[in-house]
A protein has these predicted regions:
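Active-site proximal loops enriched in glycine and acidic residues that flank catalytic Cys/His/Asp
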Residues: 9-11, 202, 222, 318-320, ...
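Structured segments of extracytoplasmic/periplasmic soluble domains
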Residues: 26-29, 309, 359-366
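Feature captures C-terminal
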Residues: 17, 327-462
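A short, polar/proline- and glycine-enriched secondary-structure boundary/capping micro-motif
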Residues: 144-148, 230, 253-260, 326-328, ...
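Short, glycine-/Ser/Thr-/acidic-enriched flexible segments
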Residues: 50, 84, 140-141, 181-182, ...
């Protein structure tokens, strides 16, 4: 007898709650349809549901996100790097205390080698037709960052191999909830043909019809709740095997209705979050402005805070990291979150004078200053002018429009080509292609769990 099983999946919501009421309505509607046809449907979230750029998530350290997943009655979740490395250790340890669903991650441990109390390496689920589905889960191993937060993250592929060995003789179907990204997921499909489906995330790919790799179906639904994915499995329950598998996505902009209850719940949580973030941090005696393409007060204040916090010789901060001004008078946690919502941590790198000068030259180009940035933790619009503390950078605009750096001093002394300097900056510059010499620096120290807005708060209390 042939039966259909649906696996609905969300990934990388990043606390874009504006789409969540539609997602809830869509999944609830589909559940009703499948129930009428006596067909089973399961629902999964594949991580990065949390993002502290959103003030409700910030105020509750992600617990409202877990509330939303509870209310949707999901069957299981994986964790992403936003759950894993943007929360203080004690907040991640408590994040899923009230979860009504299993959180599946096999490669995360505390420093004593124990899994978090809420984590399981896999789930064996008995389906309505009596077949058994093994649900595995892994997260992307950002080793040095997890280590700084007193967690141990291990190789995901080794854990997938171990988990398959444990479940393969007991499972009719094996699926993987993977927060690794498409390149690693394709490699996992090649390495582990025992997997039937990989529900993937992290790299925000939209696989409208899935992707078949080595007989393994990969499915991903982009980001921000723009889509919900659905994997449809056609199963021969008598032979206990899958005979067909396919993937699709639903564009939420085309879904006409939303859950009124969910919308009301979120509005209530917004009011509560505003109260939680109303604590006064400090008082400004005058307005503090931000200008993205020239030096201004707030980016300069952040640069000074970064230099002092990290104990670096100099610091460098792009002006676009500050999204708006602050008015004179009391400054609250909500104010600081509004102007600096990014889940970005301080970092120091060690650069020779030659490499530092090259980086400063690159930062001064119009191409970099005007660059529109997406990802890397940045939740703003544009890079903007680089602002320094501990360094004086003199530039001039040439006739051809190119900006030239004509003079650099470090704490009053001319920059020395062979001397090694400690530079405080943003962890986003250690990733991607923005500043290769920072990214490739051998000596880096991450300062965690504090975000940049925490440094601003600290500076304002001085």
């Amino acid at each position: 007898m042939l039966e259909k099983l649906r696996l609905y999946h969300t990934n990388d919501l990043h606390s874009h709650f504006e789409n969540w009421p539609k997602i809830v309505h869509y999944i609830e509607q589909k559940r009703k349809e499948h129930l009428l046809n006596s067909e089973e449907a399961l629902v999964f979230d594949i991580g990065d549901h949390v993002d502290r750029f959103q003030f409700v998530t910030e105020a509750t350290f992600g617990k409202t996100n877990v509330d939303l997943l509870n209310r949707l009655h999901i069957d299981a979740a994986a964790i992403g790097n936003n759950e894993g490395i943007t929360l203080p250790h004690e907040e991640l340890a408590a994040l899923y205390d009230h979860a009504e669903f299993p959180v599946i991650v096999s490669n995360l441990f505390d420093k004593h080698g124990k899994r978090p109390k809420w984590a399981v390496p896999y789930v064996m689920k008995t389906l309505e037709n009596g077949m058994t589905m093994a649900i595995l889960g892994v997260t992307v191993p950002y080793y040095p960052v997890y280590d700084k937060l007193d967690w141990t993250v291990t190789d995901a592929f080794e854990k997938i191999k171990e988990m398959i060995a444990e479940v393969k003789d007991r499972a009719d179907i094996i699926i993987l909830l993977s927060h690794l990204g498409i390149i690693d997921d394709q490699a996992a499909a090649e390495a582990f043909p025992e997997l039937d489906v990989i529900l993937e995330s992290h790299t925000h790919h939209l696989l409208e019809n899935g992707q078949m790799v080595n007989g393994v179906l990969l499915a991903c639904a982009e980001k921000y709740g723009n889509y919900v994915g659905c994997v449809e499995l056609v199963i021969d329950s008598k032979r206990r095997q899958i005979v067909e598998k396919k993937a699709s996505v639903q564009n939420m902009s085309e879904w006409p209705e939303e859950s009124k209850e969910t919308k009301a719940f979120l509005e209530e949580k917004e009011r509560e979050a505003e109260e939680l973030l109303a604590d006064e941090i400090g008082v400004l005696d005058k307005d503090a402005e931000v200008k993205w393409f020239e030096e201004s007060a707030l980016p300069k204040l952040l640069a000074e805070a970064l230099q002092e916090w990290c104990g670096s010789e100099i610091s460098m901060v792009n002006s676009g990291i500050i999204l708006g001004p602050l008015k004179s008078g009391p400054v609250t946690k909500l104010d600081l979150h509004r102007i600096c919502p990014h889940p970005i941590n301080p970092v120091t790198v060690r650069l020779t004078g030659e490499d530092l000068k090259e980086t400063i030259l690159q930062a001064a180009t119009e191409k970099i200053e005007q660059l529109r940035i997406k990802g890397l933790g940045f939740r703003g619009e544009v890079m903007g002018k680089m602002v320094y503390a501990g360094a004086e950078v003199q530039t001039e605009r040439l006739d051809d429009g190119i900006t030239d750096v004509i003079h650099i001093t470090i704490n009053g002394e001319h920059i020395e080509k062979d001397r090694v300097y400690t530079v405080g900056t943003l962890d986003m510059f250690t990733l991607g292609r923005l500043f290769p010499l920072i990214r490739d620096a051998e000596e880096k120290e991450f300062f965690m769990p504090e975000f940049l807005r925490d440094l601003l708060a600290w500076k304002l209390t001085q």
